[in-house]
From Swiss-Prot:
It is an enzyme of class 2 (transferase). One of its GO terms (molecular function) is N6-isopentenyladenosine methylthiotransferase activity. Keywords: 4Fe-4S, Cytoplasm, Iron, Iron-sulfur, Metal-binding, S-adenosyl-L-methionine, Transferase, tRNA processing. Its EC number is 2.8.4.3. Gene3D superfamilies: Methylthiotransferase, N-terminal domain, tm_1862 like domain. It holds the Pfam family Radical_SAM. This is tRNA-2-methylthio-N(6)-dimethylallyladenosine synthase. The gene is miaB. CDD domains: Radical_SAM. Transmembrane segments: none annotated. It comes from Xanthomonas campestris pv. campestris (strain ATCC 33913 / DSM 3586 / NCPPB 528 / LMG 568 / P 25). The lineage of its organism: Bacteria, Pseudomonadati, Pseudomonadota, Gammaproteobacteria, Lysobacterales. The keyword Nuclease does not apply. Its cofactor is [4Fe-4S] cluster.
Length: 485
């Protein structure tokens, strides 16, 4: 985007003054016109992994001329981007690798690589157990894939790089390429909270925020390509502290997530902003103020609470009480009364009693969560919680999980039903998967909506009258204003 600048972006006054922004950089490597091979990527886990996989594809398209394929048998490079959150993640990875071993039959020079959090945990052990694996790389070293591939081909030896080079990953990625009207932008990596059950600090490292201006540049580049919705990503996204100002000879200042959202909202073309995943400890008044002041900030929040018992929250090392969590929700609903709130829950944490679980259900009732990601506790090696005694029968854990999910699902169904007859602002994402003659998009509270419409509307916001609530989606029709009637 030569000549494009974000230096004149207006900013809203906050506790931190926004910096003077520089022109957008040009000249980062782009995909060559010549396709020189095929790439297959299997992705497990969170939205951050989805983002990382997209960046792997961009890096290898730009440097190696690799084009994505849906069939690993057609690929010259096959990668699995792993997740270590759930139990037996390692075994699932080795099972996948065992199936891929046959791809090398007959001497075909296929490169097999393992990335993501399991790669960070296991490192050299992956190659020792599966010597046909060519590459092992962590979330922070995916940008080094071209060098790792070349080193593997030149040396004939497997390459392992699971280091934590902090922000270097973002400095060396190609310019972003839009793939539809909604895009993810990673604004930070890692987590420094060290919850007792979680492996993320050990697999992705401590919290490191991208510089404020770098994030704005990426968003502006995506907006110029037609992106209308930005999803800001981080393991603890609301801990964001993006540096700015040091280049002018002044001490660096730091923008929080609230200021970042305010500034992104003033980039031409950006009509909706989301962020995930948050930690309640970092849910600040600045962020509440952003919900009050920034209409582009979606009327939706995902804020993982994990449990409603203070005793269990303390054992999890979450750093807050159930009352403190509810206080933050009350502040938010004072400025956005109808906001939809989703959360994460861990059921059956070591030592959880019936009374503890009842407190979780009470919290769910008090807050009125719209959606949830809920799981039975999974012991992760190397975490403090893995040493705790766990004497709750599996059947009890299963029953608790079913009860929790049934309650939240019933509440969510009620919200969907009450949306019938309302008009919702929807970003048209593309044709419906169920009916190619219809369009699909999402409401602000993350509900898929299918409706008849002209394909030329893809990438635009439209008002949709909701006519029916189904189990996992809504149906509607485009609401025309009087001038279009």
């Amino acid at each position: 985007m030569p000549g494009t600048s974000v230096s004149d972006l207006p900013t809203t006054a906050t506790a931190v003054d926004a910096p003077a922004l520089l022109p957008l950089p040009v000249g980062r490597p782009q995909a060559p016109a010549l396709v020189r091979g095929k790439l297959y990527i299997k992705t497990h886990g969170c939205q951050m992994n989805e983002y990382d996989s997209a960046k792997m594809a961009d890096v290898l398209a730009a440097s190696e001329g690799l084009e994505l394929t849906d069939n690993p048998e057609d690929a010259d490079v096959v990668l699995v981007n792993t997740c270590s959150i759930r139990e037996k993640a390692q075994e699932k990875v080795f099972s996948q690798l065992g199936r891929w071993k046959a791809l090398k039959a007959g001497g075909k020079p296929v490169i097999i690589g393992v990335g993501g959090c399991v790669a960070s945990q296991e490192g050299e052990a992956i190659v020792k157990r599966a010597p046909y694996v060519d590459l092992v790389f962590g979330p922070q070293t995916l940008h080094r894939l071209p060098e790792l591939i070349r080193a593997r081909r030149e040396s004939g030896k497997s390459q392992v790089d699971i280091s934590f080079p902090e922000i270097e990953k973002f400095d060396r990625l190609p310019e972003p390429r839009a793939d539809g009207p909604s895009a993810f932008v990673s604004i930070m990596e890692g987590c420094s909270k060290y919850c007792s059950f979680c492996v993320v600090p050990y697999t992705r490292g401590e919290e490191v925020s991208r510089p404020f201006e770098d994030v704005l540049v990426e968003v502006a580049q995506l907006a110029a390509q037609g992106v209308r919705e930005i999803n800001l990503l981080g393991q603890n996204v609301n801990a964001y502290r993006g540096a700015y100002g040091a280049d002018a000879g002044e001490p660096a200042q730091y923008a929080d997530l609230g200021l970042l959202i305010r500034t992104i909202a003033q980039i031409d073309g950006i009509g909706r902003i989301r962020f995930t995943t948050s930690h309640p400890l970092e849910f600040s008044d600045s962020l509440v103020d952003a919900y009050r002041d920034v209409p582009q900030l979606a009327n939706y929040l995902h804020l993982p609470v994990q449990a409603g018992s203070d005793r269990i929250l303390s054992a999890m090392k979450r750093g807050y009480t159930a009352l403190e969590f509810k206080s933050k929700i009350r502040k938010l609903r004072a400025v956005r009364p109808d906001i939809s709130i989703s959360s994460d829950f861990i059921v059956g944490f070591p030592g959880e009693t019936d009374a503890d679980f009842d407190k979780t259900m009470k919290l769910i009732e008090d807050v009125g969560f719209d959606q949830s990601f809920s799981f039975i506790y999974s012991r992760r090696p190397g975490t403090p919680a893995s040493d705790l005694e766990d004497d709750t029968p599996d059947a009890v854990k299963q029953a608790r999980l079913a009860r929790l999910q049934a309650h939240i699902n019933a509440h969510a169904a009620g919200i969907s039903q009450r949306m019938v007859g309302s008009v919702q602002r929807v970003l048209v994402e593309g044709p419906s998967r169920r009916d190619a003659n219809e369009l699909t998009g999402k409401t602000e509270n993350m509900r898929p909506v299918n409706f008849p419409g002209n394909p030329r509307l893809v990438g635009q916001f439209v008002d949709v009258l909701i006519t029916e609530a189904l189990s996992n989606s809504l149906r509607g029709r485009i609401q025309l204003d009087d001038s279009a009637a």
